[in-house]
C-alpha cells in the first residue's frame, strides 16, 4: 500500500518481458486450429468475425498482419496474442504490488496464472482470450490504483480512464460485463461517499464509456463496404447490428445454440477441480487466506478491494455455470467451457498473491526481526511459479506444431483444378479459408460454406465473391420453395443438381447421378468438379490415396482442443480415411450398380477399415461397429481370397468391443443377438475344418 509506483512499474515490465520470452519460444508457427482460422481471415480481409464480432481484436490482428515483419499471417497474430498475454501478466503483478507492496506476491499472481496450462495454451494461439485476460488485469489494476489514490483529482482521472476501458473491453469478449457490473457500482459508491460524484462527473463517465465502444462502428462500416471475401452477418441495418452484437444466432445469454448442458452444480464442481489442477491447491489456499485476512484490523484499508474481487469471482462463476449450456462430460465441450474459466482464474491468482503478502506481513508482526520470513516468501512464490513452468512447458510448446496447417495444405493441394468445395465444420472450414484467403493457396478453388448458406445474409454478402457458383435462390433450406416473406429457398438437391445426403457413420447415404462428379474426401467436406458421368474408380482412388488424408501428421492435439472431435484429435488423417471408407461402404449399400462393382466396393471398404482399425489401438468406439459390419458384409460375398472363419471372428470381436463401450446404443441388444448367431456360425466353420 502506497508502494513505490515507479519501482512497481519497472518490475511489472521486466516480468512481462520474461513471460513474453517464454510465450514467444512456444508459439505455433502456423495455424493453431479452433476459431483462429476464422478470426485471422476476418482480420486479413477486414471482414466481421463470428458474433459478437470482436472488432477490437479484428483491428489489432489486422495491424499485426500488416506491420509485424516475421512469419506467416497466422504466426503474426499468434505473436500478438502472446504479447497481449504477457501484458496481462504485468497487470496482475502490478495489481498485487499496488495493494500489498509485495514483489513476491505479485510474481506469484502473475506466474501461476500465466504459466498454467490453460492460460499458456490460449495465450499463444490467435484467439480472443489473451486480450480478455489483458482487460481483466487492466480493470483490476485500475481498481487497485483507484483505491490507493490520495486525492479527488486522481480518483476522477482514474474513474474516467476506467470507464473508457470498461467500454473498450466490451469490444472483445462480453463475459467481462460481469466484472464491470461489480466494479462500476463499487467505484460510484466510493465516489459518492467522498462527495465526489456529481451529475456532471457521472455524465463524463458515461461519455468515456461510450467512447470505449467506438470500435463497434467497424462492424457496419465493413458490412457496408462488403469487400471481404469472408465475413459474418449483415450489420448495415440496426437490427442486423443488434443481432450480431447480442449473439442472437447463438443465444444471447447462452454459450451455444440448441444444446442441453450440465447442471449448475456439476459445472461449479468441474470449475473447482479445474482451478485445483491449473493453479494448484496451495494457490487456492492462499486465495482463501486473502479473504480471511479481511477480518484482521491491520488489513482494513484493502479489505474493500479484496471483497470486490471475491464478489466478482462468485458472480462470474455462478452466472457462467447457470448459462453455459454444454455437456462438460464430453471432452470437446469441456475444452470449449474451460477457456471461459480463465477470467475467474485471474482473480484467484491475484487473491493468492495478496494472501502470500498477508502471511508474510502477519509473520513479520509475530516474529519481529526474523530474516527468514522474506526469504520464505520469495522461495514460496518462485517454487510455485517454477512448478507451473516445469509441469506445463512441454504440453504447451507448440513451436513444432504444423498439424492443422499440413491438414489444410494437403487437402487443398490434392483438389482438382477449379474445384468448388462445400465446407461443413470448424476444422475444415476455418483451416481451408485461412490458407486459401490469407496465404493465397489455390486461387482457382472456390470455397462455399454449406452451413452458412442457411443464414439469410450469406448469399447477399458473399455470393459476389464466389464467381462461377450459381445459387438457385436466396438461401439454403432443407425444403425448397417460397417462404411466407417471399424468400426463395433451395435445397442441396437443387444446388448440386444431384441428390446427396451425408451424415455421421451409420446414419446416412450418398448418391449421385450424371452431370456432376462428386468426390467425398471426408465427412464434412465435399469436392465437386463438373464432369460427365459418375466415375466410381476415380472416387475410390482419389478418396483414399490423396495425400490430404493418408500422409502422417505429427500429433500435438488435445481432445479438449476445438481442432478435432472428442477422442479423434490425434487421429485426423485416419479419421478422414475412416469417413472415406464409410462413404465407399455406404455407396455399396445404396448405389444401383452390378454385383461385380458392389463386390469391389465392399472389398475396398473392408480393406480400408481393417488397415485403419489395426493401426490405431486407441480409436473412437464407433470404428469397432463400422469395421464389424464391413467384415459381416465381406462374409456374405463368399470370396475365396478371404478366410470366412477370420471374418466371423473379427465380426464377433469388434461387435463385442463396441457393445462394451457403447452401452447407450439403442441397437445394442440387436447387436448382441446377432453376435450369438455369429458365434454359432463360427463354431460350424471350425467343425468343417476338423
Label every PLM stretch briefly.
Residues 42-71, 82-83, 90:
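Short hydrophobic/aromatic helix or loop-helix immediately within or flanking a transmembrane segment
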Amino acid at each position: 500500500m502506497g508502494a513505490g509506483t515507479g519501482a512497481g512499474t519497472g518490475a511489472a515490465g521486466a516480468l512481462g518481458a520474461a513471460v513474453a520470452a517464454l510465450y514467444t519460444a512456444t508459439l505455433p508457427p502456423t495455424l493453431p486450429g479452433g476459431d483462429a482460422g476464422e478470426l485471422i481471415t476476418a482480420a486479413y480481409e477486414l471482414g466481421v468475425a463470428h458474433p459478437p464480432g470482436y472488432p477490437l481484436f479484428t483491428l489489432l490482428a489486422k495491424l499485426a498482419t500488416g506491420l509485424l515483419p516475421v512469419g506467416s499471417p497466422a504466426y503474426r497474430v499468434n505473436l500478438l496474442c502472446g504479447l497481449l498475454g504477457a501484458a496481462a501478466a504485468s497487470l496482475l503483478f502490478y495489481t498485487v504490488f499496488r495493494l500489498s507492496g509485495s514483489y513476491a506476491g505479485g510474481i506469484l499472481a502473475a506466474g501461476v496464472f500465466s504459466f498454467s496450462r490453460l492460460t499458456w495454451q490460449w495465450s499463444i494461439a490467435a484467439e480472443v482470450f489473451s486480450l480478455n485476460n489483458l482487460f481483466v488485469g487492466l480493470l483490476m489494476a485500475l481498481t487497485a490504483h483507484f483505491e490507493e489514490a490520495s486525492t479527488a483529482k486522481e480518483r476522477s482521472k482514474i474513474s474516467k480512464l476506467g470507464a473508457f476501458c470498461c467500454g473498450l473491453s466490451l469490444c472483445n469478449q462480453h463475459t467481462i460485463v460481469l466484472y464491470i457490473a461489480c466494479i462500476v457500482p463499487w467505484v460510484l459508491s466510493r465516489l459518492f461517499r467522498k462527495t465526489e460524484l456529481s451529475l456532471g462527473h457521472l455524465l463524463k463517465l458515461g461519455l468515456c464509456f461510450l467512447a470505449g465502444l467506438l470500435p463497434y462502428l467497424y462492424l457496419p462500416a465493413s458490412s457496408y463496404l462488403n469487400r471481404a471475401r469472408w465475413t459474418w452477418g449483415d450489420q448495415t441495418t440496426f437490427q442486423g447490428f443488434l443481432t450480431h452484437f447480442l449473439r442472437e444466432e447463438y443465444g444471447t445469454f447462452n454459450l451455444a445454440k440448441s444444446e442441453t448442458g450440465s447442471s449448475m452444480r456439476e459445472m461449479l464442481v468441474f470449475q473447482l477441480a479445474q482451478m485445483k489442477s491449473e493453479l494448484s491447491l496451495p494457490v487456492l489456499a492462499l486465495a482463501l487466506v486473502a479473504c480471511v485476512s479481511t477480518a484482521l484490523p491491520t488489513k482494513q484499508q484493502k479489505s474493500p478491494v479484496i471483497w470486490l474481487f471475491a464478489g466478482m469471482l462468485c458472480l462470474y462463476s455462478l452466472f457462467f455455470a447457470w448459462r453455459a449450456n454444454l455437456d462438460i462430460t464430453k471432452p470437446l465441450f469441456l475444452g470449449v467451457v474451460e477457456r471461459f474459466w480463465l477470467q475467474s482464474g485471474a482473480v484467484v491468482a491475484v487473491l493468492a498473491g495478496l494472501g502470500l503478502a498477508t502471511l508474510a506481513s502477519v509473520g513479520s508482526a509475530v516474529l519481529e526481526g526474523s530474516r527468514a520470513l522474506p526469504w520464505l516468501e520469495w522461495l514460496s512464490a518462485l517454487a510455485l511459479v517454477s512448478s507451473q513452468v516445469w509441469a506445463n512447458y512441454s504440453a504447451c510448446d507448440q513451436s513444432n506444431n504444423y498439424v492443422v496447417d499440413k491438414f489444410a495444405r494437403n487437402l487443398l493441394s490434392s483438389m482438382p483444378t477449379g474445384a468448388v468445395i462445400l465446407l461443413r465444420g470448424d476444422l475444415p472450414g476455418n483451416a481451408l479459408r485461412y490458407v486459401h484467403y490469407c496465404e493465397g493457396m489455390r486461387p482457382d478453388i472456390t470455397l462455399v460454406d454449406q452451413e452458412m448458406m442457411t443464414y439469410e445474409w450469406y448469399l447477399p454478402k458473399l455470393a459476389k465473391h464466389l464467381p462461377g457458383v450459381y445459387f438457385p435462390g436466396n438461401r439454403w433450406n432443407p425444403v425448397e420453395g417460397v417462404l411466407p416473406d417471399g424468400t426463395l429457398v433451395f435445397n442441396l438437391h437443387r444446388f448440386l443438381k444431384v441428390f446427396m445426403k451425408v451424415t455421421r457413420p451409420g446414419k446416412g447415404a450418398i448418391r449421385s447421378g450424371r452431370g456432376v462428379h462428386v468426390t467425398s474426401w471426408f465427412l464434412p467436406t465435399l469436392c465437386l468438379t463438373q464432369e460427365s458421368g459418375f466415375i466410381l474408380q476415380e472416387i475410390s482412388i482419389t478418396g483414399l490415396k490423396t495425400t490430404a488424408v493418408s500422409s502422417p501428421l505429427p500429433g500435438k492435439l488435445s481432445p479438449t482442443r476445438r481442432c478435432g472431435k472428442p477422442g479423434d484429435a490425434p487421429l485426423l488423417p485416419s479419421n478422414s480415411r475412416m469417413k472415406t471408407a464409410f462413404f465407399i461402404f455406404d455407396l455399396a449399400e445404396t448405389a444401383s450398380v452390378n454385383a461385380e462393382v458392389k463386390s469391389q466396393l465392399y472389398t475396398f471398404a473392408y480393406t480400408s477399415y481393417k488397415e485403419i482399425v489395426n493401426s490405431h489401438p486407441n480409436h473412437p468406439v464407433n470404428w469397432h461397429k463400422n469395421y464389424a459390419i464391413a467384415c459381416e458384409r465381406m462374409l456374405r460375398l463368399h470370396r475365396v481370397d478371404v478366410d470366412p472363419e477370420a471374418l466371423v471372428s473379427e465380426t464377433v470381436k469388434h461387435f463385442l468391443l463396441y457393445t462394451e463401450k457403447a452401452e447407450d446404443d439403442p441397437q445394442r441388444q440387436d447387436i448382441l443377438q446377432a453376435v450369438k448367431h455369429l458365434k454359432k456360425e463360427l463354431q460350424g466353420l471350425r467343425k468343417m475344418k476338423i
